[in-house]
């Protein structure tokens, strides 16, 4: 799928999310693009990399490979399966693991759940104050710990800019 095809396919869901919640469709599209590799990794209709919770029913979760960057080498107990751990030059540790992620019946359900995720989790309260500005929202979502990648906000902002150029 090309980037233009990705935008065409998922923009209606992102616009509907923006209409319902006020969260910028540019942010939503950018995060879906980043987390799914522009639609290359959409297992279980999941585009946003939202982790399953312990109480998530078995039919609503899936065990997938992922990368996490953490501060210590002894945090493997946090994951169902650890594949490898490498120390990075900055003193942090890159974990290749399998972890539980949410799974959806439809992609539309995924977009709806993604927006609700920000409203349900109090750590995103500050981000929601700037939800209509995709760049500020990206900064605040990253600060709140959505992902462990150290350059998460800058990656999102580059993709937002790219999507804007296609609109």
Where are these regions (language model features)?
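Catalytic cores of secreted/periplasmic lytic hydrolases that degrade extracellular macromolecules
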Residues: 1-167
